[in-house]
Amino acid sequence: MESTDVINEIRGILPRNSIGKYDLLTIFTHKTVFDKIVKVLSLDFQNKVDYVAAPEAIGWILGTAIAKELGVGFIGVRKGDKLPYAKEEIISTHFTDYSGQDKSFEISKSSIVRNKRVLIVDDWIETGSQMKAVIALLEKLDCSIIGLATIGIDINEV
């Protein structure tokens, strides 16, 4: 299965009336396309990772599916101030997102993911600031980032 075939299927599904960016949730409603996306994004990481990590919220949809495909655990990276722990129990990192807003990601210090091999997954990357923040957060737990997996489509061609 070629990734270009999957990209062409995605292009055929994405609504043409989006403003600014595409709503990738639309492609997740197509089971066969969603399954193909998960398989393509998982291919290079079989037996190479201990966990898949993804930022809240849409990244979790793709990340959990890829974790299941790879037979590994999932790390849900939370948006700031969402974890039910005292501040001293949380590791966080701050970043400026694609729209210029200050944001943060968090994970519990008691997380069992220290010193593990991790694949980071998200639905799309615009500026890379969100991915960089997830990398920084996991590196605070001494994790090895094995790779990044995301849906890559040139918006100009859709």
Residue ranges with predicted function:
Residues 1-49:
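Active-site-facing substrate-recognition patch
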Residues 72-118:
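Short, glycine/charge-rich flexible loops or terminal/linker lids adjacent to PRPP-binding catalytic cores
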Residues 99-158:
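PRPP/pyrophosphate-binding module of the type I phosphoribosyltransferase fold
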Residues 49-56:
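Short glycine-rich phosphate-binding loop at a beta-alpha junction
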Residues 56-61, 127:
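Gly/Ser/Thr-rich loops at beta-strand to alpha-helix junctions
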Residues 61-70, 135:
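Short Gly/Thr/Asp-enriched flexible loops that form oxyanion-binding sites at enzyme active sites
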Residues 57, 79-81, 153-154:
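Short, ordered loop/turn segments at secondary-structure junctions
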